[in-house]
Amino acid sequence: MSAICQVTGRKPEFGKQVSHSHRRTSRRWNPNVQRRRYYLPSEGRTITLTVSTKGMKIIDRDGIESVVAKIRARGEKI
């Protein structure tokens, strides 16, 4: 599963882990993404989205219909 949110576009970020002795090694911070199913009443079917927890709050605030319209306007297939 890809660690990219379909609503916000959040991706993993990269940086350095710094130990107590200040030795630096590469690491990545993954966003908290979940696979969630949402029901689209206009189409009468459910869709599965990979969304971050912030994306879930956006869906709760704006509604699934408007969020799906924005995703489709970007050219992403759902």
From Swiss-Prot:
Gene Ontology molecular function, alphabetical: structural constituent of ribosome
GO biological process: translation
Coiled coil regions, renumbered to chain: none
InterPro entries found in the cross-reference section: Ribosomal_bL28, Ribosomal_bL28/bL31-like_sf, Ribosomal_bL28_bact-type, Ribosomal_bL28_sf
GO cellular component: ribonucleoprotein complex; ribosome
Key word Ribosomal protein present: yes
Record keywords, A-Z: Ribonucleoprotein, Ribosomal protein
Keyword RNA-binding applies: no
HAMAP family xrefs: Ribosomal_bL28
Family according to the record: Belongs to the bacterial ribosomal protein bL28 family.
Entry protein name: Large ribosomal subunit protein bL28
Native organism: Corynebacterium aurimucosum (strain ATCC 700975 / DSM 44827 / CIP 107346 / CN-1)
